[in-house]
């Protein structure tokens, strides 16, 4: 069944141009440049794909945020995934992009080419079946993502416990959006004065998670959908707040997002996970209380604890020429990087921003090469 009739109004050329004209009229009244961070990689791709940046006036600038979980995963965590795959009788599972990002040993795809058992999953629920089919193997799910995907990992874990599947383990890399944005806004060099907040994250956690950012940093935040009309309407809402010297949290994506979020999904996560005290982010460094871990009651499923002796916990240096860290902070654009589209391409990625389909460099490579 086609859903074109549902999507087409949000891609209507007449509506897009009308919103663009209204944005230009209001932007003319701004006293200073409006620097908008679109936190989510999905927004970055929509801006590029539909040429929305070309419809913006010069005094509106977009900077690309850390809303790509694979992009912000440090090499140490990637190395741990490889080390787990290197164990005897192990099967490592993860979702698509995580398989492609190279750590200091290489990527999980390269591990597979060397004969190690590393597998793509289309759904986290597949981990249960693979564990059942391989009772004498150590099956390790590399769980990654923001608040959006965390309930799925929690559901798999709770199902494994209920079904007494004892050979399935979890390497938890679930991270939290508000804390990463807060770390960026705290930087004295930060010029960002408005935010487009991720909507898929908000479906789960609710728009409420951004309220502390509004209160602390006094800037407007709009939870925006991903279609062109969604984004332009959200920009218009940001402009109106800026002109009225307001700093409020508003939801543009009301057809999917509420203030409270999905409380059932939140309960799943709270049943088995808790906040870590520290977590290292690529490009952003250590951010306190910015990620999740398994609760002690689930320690027997925690790959970091069960297989601690196999994990080196080493740190490895990034390529000095790669600007992925600065791009994730919003202080550089992909075109500022000397490696972009030369040494670093989707076929030969140097940095994680090019590897992930949600990465800013991947978006620029696909839609905005010069």
Task: Label each PLM-derived region with a short phrase.
Residues 174-181, 261-264:
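Short, conserved secondary-structure transition motifs
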Residues 121, 142, 224-225:
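Active-site-adjacent beta-strand anchor residues
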Residues 233-326:
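Internal helical hairpin/lid segments
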Residues 171, 189-258:
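A conserved active-site cap/scaffold subdomain adjacent to cofactor or substrate pockets
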Residues 2-136, 150, 154, 158-163, ...:
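Metallocofactor- and cofactor-centric catalytic cores in central/energy metabolism, strongly enriched
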């Amino acid at each position: 069944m086609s859903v074109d009739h549902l999507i087409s109004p949000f891609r209507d050329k007449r509506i897009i141009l009308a919103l663009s004209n209204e944005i230009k009229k209001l932007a003319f009244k701004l006293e200073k440049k409006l620097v908008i961070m679109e936190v989510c990689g999905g927004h970055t791709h929509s801006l590029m794909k539909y040429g929305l940046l070309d419809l913006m006036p010069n005094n509106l600038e977009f900077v690309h945020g850390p809303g790509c979980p694979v992009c912000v995963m440090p090499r140490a965590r990637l190395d741990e995934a490889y080390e787990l795959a290197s164990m005897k009788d192990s099967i490592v599972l993860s979702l698509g992009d995580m398989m492609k990002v190279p750590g200091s040993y290489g990527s999980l795809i390269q591990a597979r080419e060397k004969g190690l058992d590393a597998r793509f999953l289309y759904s986290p629920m597949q981990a249960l079946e693979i564990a059942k089919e391989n009772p004498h193997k150590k099956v390790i799910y590399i769980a990654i993502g923001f608040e959006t995907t965390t309930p799925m990992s929690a559901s798999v874990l709770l199902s494994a416990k209920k079904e007494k599947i004892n050979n399935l383990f979890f390497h938890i890399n679930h991270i939290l959006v508000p804390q990463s944005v807060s770390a960026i806004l705290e930087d004295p060099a930060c010029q960002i004065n408005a935010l487009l907040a991720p909507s898929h994250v908000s479906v789960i956690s609710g728009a409420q998670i951004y309220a502390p950012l509004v209160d602390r940093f006094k800037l407007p935040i709009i939870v925006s959908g991903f279609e062109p009309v969604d984004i332009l309407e959200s920009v218009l809402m940001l402009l109106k707040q800026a002109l009225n010297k307001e700093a409020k949290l508003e939801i543009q994506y009301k057809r999917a997002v509420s203030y409270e979020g999905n409380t059932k999904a939140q309960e799943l996560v709270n049943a088995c996970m808790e906040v870590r005290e520290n977590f290292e982010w690529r490009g952003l460094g250590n951010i306190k209380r910015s990620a999740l871990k398994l609760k002690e009651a689930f320690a027997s499923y925690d790959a970091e604890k069960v297989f601690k002796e196999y994990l080196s916990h080493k740190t490895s240096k990034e390529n000095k020429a790669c600007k992925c860290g600065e791009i994730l902070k919003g202080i550089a654009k992909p075109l500022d990087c000397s490696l972009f589209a030369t040494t670093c391409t989707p076929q030969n990625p140097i940095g994680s921003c090019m590897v992930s389909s949600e990465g800013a460099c991947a978006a620029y490579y696909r839609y905005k090469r010069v």
